[in-house]
UniProtKB/Swiss-Prot annotation:
It is found in: Cell inner membrane. The chain crosses the membrane at residues 26-46, 65-85, 144-164, 166-186, 250-270, 276-296. ATP binds at residues 377-384. NCBIfam families: MsbA_lipidA. Residues 29-311 form the ABC transmembrane type-1 domain. SUPFAM superfamilies: ABC transporter transmembrane region, P-loop containing nucleoside triphosphate hydrolases. It is a multi-pass membrane protein. It catalyses: ATP + H2O + lipid A-core oligosaccharideSide 1 = ADP + phosphate + lipid A-core oligosaccharideSide 2. This is ATP-dependent lipid A-core flippase. It is an enzyme of class 7 (translocase). It comes from Nitrosococcus oceani (strain ATCC 19707 / BCRC 17464 / JCM 30415 / NCIMB 11848 / C-107).
Amino acid sequence: MTFTPSLNSGLAVYRRLLSYTRPYRWIFAASIITMAIYAATETGLAALMKPLMDGSFIERDPATIQIIPLLLIGLFVIRGGANFITQYGLKWVARRVVRDLREQMFCHLLALPARYYDQKASGQLLAKLIYDVEQVSNAATDAILTIIRDSLTILGLLAWMAYLNGLLTLIILVTAPLIALIIWWVSHRFRRISRKIQNSMGDVSQVAQETIEGHREVKIFGGQTYEAERFDQVNEQNRRQTMKMAATDAISQPVVQLIAVLGLAGVIHLATRESMLAQISVGTFISFITAMMLLLGPVKRLTKINGTLQRGIAAAQSIFGLLAETPEADRGQQSLRRARGAIRFEHLSFCYEPAKGPVLENIDLEIKPYQTIALVGHSGSGKSTLVSLLARFYETTSGRILIDEMDIQTLRLTELRRQIALVSQQIILFNDTIAHNIAYGSYQQTSKQDIIRAAEAAHAMEFINRLPDGLDTVIGEKGVLLSGGQRQRLAIARALLKDAPILILDEATASLDTEAERHIQAALETLMRQRTTLVIAHRLSTVENADQIIVLHQGQIIERGTHSQLLARESHYAGLYRLQFRHSHEHVSPLSANVGL
């Protein structure tokens, strides 16, 4: 995602970031006001030095001697109160902004098309959601606090110094262009390095996530050394980028302070000349020097905060880049209460990337309500792509798909997907209770009895009742605490509860033992009843009983018919069938033979 030049500027990005504080503008404004009060106390402290020296030590004025201590106490009480309101108020606003940004990003991720996820690593997306947003939080608190409060402090102190002696103040101002030039150079370098750090954090997250999720494969194939080396490589890259920023920060701060001290030394040299001493009092001189010394702290913090600010801007650019991604198209306006289940593919073609050619080409297929259609073919023939287009996970390149004579492009996405249920081999379950997984997407509207009925129809209550917490059992990430057959039955129960008129079975009983398969087949028979069903690479028994078998090869339909009709033709399907039949006699699962049925 590329930004327009205006959006690419740091100021435009930061302005957009600050727009997220608008709902909390009163607390934000109160924090700004207390920043100004805090900054004024710095100038007040320097100003008190003049009457303290002249009135107390030189003139020995009793009134001054009595009031100065009280003024100092009052000054620091005000300073402490202003600091508390500023710090707490800004942190409160910043965490609200972080929450809002994360919610907006997460909702936007849910709306992005499948093609986006095909092109992006999940670790990179997680890094944006977690690491980048935290960098924005720092820019919204520490950076704002330092920029506004310390800038006001510097302006106040300079104004007081100019009031005391304009010539000496001018010497200090001579150093300002040099300091500004250094800060400008550091800002650009910080932002450039920050982008690289964010990318490297995404790489670290991605490698760690893959290794943790695939820990069984890593162990069984002895990949520990390889994964350790891969993680060390991305971790080292992150360290290098971070050290580049640390080096820039470490160099810039002392250089800026050195320039400021040179100005201070020049002022002291000039102020201690006899001609100048005759013009100013001791109190004026001490007050001026105090103001100069108080300047060093804000200048140092402004230089130091630059790294935080640039990291925040770079992170905000990354976040806004994600938010600028186009959500999946949902231009349909029509509703569909419940489809009969008639499906028609007309002259359908599709390609993931134009340069690589079509994955599906000129597909014409009509499916009547309640029919079971089996899609068979070698891996890569386009079976899964075809059903993905039916659910509009991708947009067709040409042609159209109709459900009950309605073009799916005219339907709202929610209406279309409400008509479809999916059961696949790679079941996605969530780290939640069994009940929440069965009623996923509709738990609040579903009674416990409905969940139990769906689980019973899916032959799942048999193992659920043996669990200590029953339906309230938490099944772990991706259902890791359950067996493969148990996860399949929960997926079937989820599809039964949804009660959609169109069902997609994607290798739904592959790689199961005999007992598990018996339960699954019985549950599937219940699930497929009175539904239009598309079966991908299903078990041979289901393929044989299909109303129509569609044979795909290199994205085209090369055969269609019933099981007996296709066998009689002695063509492509018959060859696949004989190959699976031979494997089954060798006690190998037909699907594990990877011939695509």
